[in-house]
Regions:
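N-terminal alpha/beta PP-like core and its mobile active-site loop of ThDP/TPP-dependent enzymes
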Residues: 1-201
């Protein structure tokens, strides 16, 4: 079945077991908020400022041992998260911060409330990414939660452009994490071991 990116976002939160979302609405994230309206099992907490919500998500993560989750709009909404993201990074607190973004074709054109939040936060989080294809949305969210909670826990930023939120695509959520990178071989090659031993002699 096909659903839009905003509904896929909600499904992803439910699949990841998110029960509390700290959020502040705005134009480039409004479709995500609309999709959350009927979502079951997710309590939305709406502080009066984005900085308050990121610190609240940090406190939630520290007190529950779960990933704290934020949702804000682009521009000042996103930049108001920066201190909280840095705090979570320095204290190894798992957060996933979702930011709305202008449509892909407007990125780099100085559009209203366009800001390079990935560039701003890259040095203060474990991973920051802009979703550029609707078919990558579910995988990126799955990876974001995995990255936030594994190894040294910390914050992850996922920037979702408005056209990705509206684009139609599969409703399938991945069951496994798929991150490109080094995957060590678990088997041994006897011939290579013999050759290495021979070279040591």
């Amino acid at each position: 079945m096909e659903i839009n990116g905003a509904k896929m976002f909600v499904k992803a939160l439910q699949e990841e077991g998110v029960d509390t979302l700290f959020a502040y609405p705005g134009g480039t994230a409004i479709d995500l908020f609309d999709a959350l309206y009927d979502a079951e099992g997710i309590d939305m907490i709406l502080p009066r400022h984005e900085q308050a919500l990121v610190h609240a998500a940090d406190g939630y993560a520290r007190s529950t041992g779960r990933v704290g989750v934020c949702l804000v709009t682009s521009g000042p909404g996103a930049t108001n998260l920066v201190t909280g993201i840095a705090t979570a990074n320095y204290d190894s607190v798992p957060l996933v911060c979702f930011t709305g973004q202008v449509p892909l074709n407007l990125i780099g054109n100085d559009a209203f409330q366009e800001v390079d939040i990935v560039g701003i936060t890259r040095s203060i989080c474990k991973y920051a990414v802009t979703v550029r294809k609707r078919e990558d949305l579910a995988r990126i969210i799955k990876n974001a939660f995995y990255i936030a909670r594994t190894g040294k826990p910390g914050p992850v930023v996922v920037d979702i452009p408005k056209d990705i939120q509206l684009a139609m695509g599969s409703d399938e959520y991945p069951s496994e994490v798929n991150i490109r990178g080094y995957k060590p071989s678990e088997g041994v090659h006897v011939g290579q071991i013999k050759r290495a031993l021979a070279e040591l002699k």
